[in-house]
């Protein structure tokens, strides 16, 4: 009798594990979880909770490592625009700095420990979300291009939050987690690396703007070439039935006939798949290029810098936009430099 009981208990445990696996990998759930979701959900929740608490009530952080803490929380006097989670202190550099590595919680907060906690958990969650997209596509029999497209913003987040601090030797150089902090990072990055003159930045701008142009063009042509299924008194939108197999707009009328007559007829699209491919490919390639550029400049492979101005045959200075850009970079570098505490000459003489 005892043998039968042990077998039934083992079978019950096996059934519960199998049911858990089926529930995790089921495509019938309202929200697909997947095995990547098992890791994604707790990491993103941890990053979100820590970010909200730090954004509201974090104490000042000695980000430059010179005993001049910077406060970024709302309770410290900031508003929603200026508030940010301040990066980990330069005194920590690239060391892994969990709570148990600090002597006290106050020390961990003073050195910007929450920034590392948020960044590491967030990046793990982002890449698990990418894996979850691939996993759901695989189980539904779809091709994996959704995950490939999402790899572009995932790579961009990894570049500014992890690769750039590693290349610069300190997490204090990472992106501050806030609105004004993001623009501060952009200005400091331009001053240090001249990203506006880097080919990867050019490719990124061309890809993102090209994708935006193509998306607005395609969307406007679709809305303008809807196939009417209703009377003149009713809206065309009322003729759509959810899940219908019939097409809802005339692709050739919009892209080939209308757009072809506005521009070059031979360049008018005849295939909707090619349009949607370029709508996905252009911004994906552009953001990939920008992420690669951040990775290159993290190790000081900077943009073009024309340090020597153009001179005419008589040696006279000819001003160009490159000179204006260099002057702007020098000005931003001066504002970005930490306070070195230069004492007045009188005090320095008395100290001697």
UniProtKB/Swiss-Prot annotation:
Record site feature (Tyrosine radical intermediate), residues: 164
GO BP terms, alphabetized: photosynthetic electron transport in photosystem II; response to herbicide
Enzyme class, broadest EC rank: oxidoreductase
Gene Ontology molecular function: chlorophyll binding; electron transporter, transferring electrons within the cyclic electron transport pathway of photosynthesis activity; iron ion binding; oxidoreductase activity, acting on diphenols and related substances as donors, oxygen as acceptor; oxygen evolving activity
Binding residues annotated for a quinone, in chain numbering: 218
Subcellular location: Cellular thylakoid membrane
Binding site for [CaMn4O5] cluster: 173, 192, 336, 348
Functional description taken from the UniProt entry: Photosystem II (PSII) is a light-driven water:plastoquinone oxidoreductase that uses light energy to abstract electrons from H(2)O, generating O(2) and a proton gradient subsequently used for ATP formation. It consists of a core antenna complex that captures photons, and an electron transfer chain that converts photonic excitation into a charge separation. The D1/D2 (PsbA/PsbD) reaction center heterodimer binds P680, the primary electron donor of PSII as well as several subsequent electron acceptors.
Protein name listed in UniProt: Photosystem II protein D1 2
Annotated organism of origin: Synechococcus sp. (strain JA-3-3Ab)
